[in-house]
């Protein structure tokens, strides 16, 4: 029981009168003894007060350090300067001979088929000025440029087929072709001689200075709010959807038969860890050679997309602008069916649940898997495909 002491003070004038009436040998200088009065606070009130202090909510939107803001790409805390700097979009091969550096730092990672059922990756890097080595860099495919547009990113590639000429030649396209501007890359030790072109922050800045590209976002291009994020303190668990499916494993091997990638939900981290079995390689975690980290994502999106085969070489075309296609959104070990819309070159691809509401993504990195319409994949061995 908590106690508080209330001192009963004697009125000085009354004390003098009392001592004056005493025996002659008693002195007015004798000390006055003050008797404490003990008041007890009821136990239930004390516990209520303690609980009230303990239940004070933590404000998730208070920056951990001065000068930090929520990233427009991941909703994570980043330095305000990073948030105001345009990201870079880098084309990265995904084969057993690829030497991938810095890929685990991509805020958003796209994967899509190219010719021969191989996949190519494109990383959107917001904090690229703090990544020592990025790459290796490979050639462009025109449909990736439209996804890079959504972020107003500087698009970095190593040449590409003639199909890219129109979009790369546009005045508003701000790209760095490492064949044309050789100072943007350097050759370094790699698994083979065709996958050894890398870049770095100083080389990217040099290329941007050369072409006169602004470091900060251009006005009236990409949407300032791309993904819609749930509050960091109240993540989207998908429990509000009665038809949400279990998704502890997302297997994309039928869509990507050369990559054979899949994702396992990690309950300890709350993210999806990426694995793959590349043609000619062994199965295992997808690892960034720069830091030996496995690729991991808070959000995984499967985006069914109309496609065509362009020629006998197998070059593909994907319809990046659409309002009629669907897909799936996965997070926290569950998934829901979604539809998606992209209505302009720089407009964001937006995802909607079956109620027509825009899906709230969770704070963290996002994997976007572009699949050919009609292809199927599995979530916990349940086959899923487009609902046309």
Residue ranges with predicted function:
Residues 1-5, 11:
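Positively charged n-region of N-terminal signal peptides that target proteins for export
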Residues 5-7, 26, 73-75:
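Sequence-pattern detector for short linear motifs
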Residues 9-10, 43:
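Compositionally biased, low-complexity segments
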Residues 17-20:
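C-terminal motif of bacterial Sec signal peptides marking the signal peptidase cleavage site
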Residues 22-24:
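Bacterial signal peptide processing site
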Residues 30-39, 51-110, 115-388:
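A surface/extracellular/periplasmic glyco- and lipid-processing/surface-interacting theme
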